Regions:
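Acetyl-CoA-dependent GNAT
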Residues: 3-91, 95-97, 114, 145-154
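Alpha-helical elements of the RecA-like P-loop NTPase motor core of helicases
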Residues: 13, 135-136
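Conserved GNAT acetyl-CoA-binding A-motif
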Residues: 87, 108, 116-126, 149
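Conserved acetyl-CoA pyrophosphate-binding loop and the N-cap/start of the following alpha-helix
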Residues: 98, 102-110
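Conserved beta-strand-loop-alpha-helix junction that forms the acyl-donor binding cleft
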Residues: 99, 125-134, 151-155
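Conserved active-site tyrosine of GNAT-family acetyltransferases
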Residues: 138, 143
Length: 155
């Protein structure tokens, strides 16, 4: 079993160090950003979303840890989209060695319980089309596609 524990400032800084280049690379791969601008755009996106860092209002950043030994195996970040009773998952990552063991599903279910405690009625998220494992997880948990972006490369 896993549990969600609020992220510390140190964990948040480590998360940013890893997530900013990952988010930049995902947007380059999806064709949204050029490589030249990607890192700066990613930095700005995180700064805008989390102006007070880990203490940013209505944002909930958790480390995912195993209950039996306290090992940190990932993280998840949800924002309450005030004033709506809606949460949005901005980031969710499990260590590669911990994938395929049911921990992702457990973490998502734990986050759903937390969202219910906040009296949220819905949770949304974005997933890149090439992340088929994540899409399978989300669909299995009852998430539905509400919109899609489509791109055609012109040669």
């Amino acid at each position: 079993m896993v549990r969600l524990v609020p992220m510390t400032e140190t964990e948040f800084e480590a998360h940013l160090e890893k997530s900013i280049p990952e988010y930049a690379a995902e947007n380059v791969a999806a064709g949204y950003w050029s490589e030249e601008e990607a890192l700066e755009r990613s930095r700005k996106a995180f700064a805008n979303l989390l102006p007070q860092g880990v203490k940013s209002e209505n944002n909930y950043l958790f480390r995912i840890q195993l209950e039996e030994n306290g090992e940190k195996i990932g993280m998840i970040w949800m924002k309450h989209e005030v004033p709506r009773p809606h949460g949005f998952i901005y980031d969710f990552a499990l260590d590669e060695t911990q994938r395929g063991k049911g921990y992702g599903k457990q973490a998502m279910l734990a986050l759903e319980e937390f969202a219910k405690e906040l009296d949220l009625k819905t949770i949304g998220l974005h997933v890149f089309a090439n992340n088929t494992a994540a899409m399978k997880l989300y669909k299995g948990l009852g998430y539905e596609v509400t919109s899609q972006n489509m791109t055609k490369k012109l040669v």
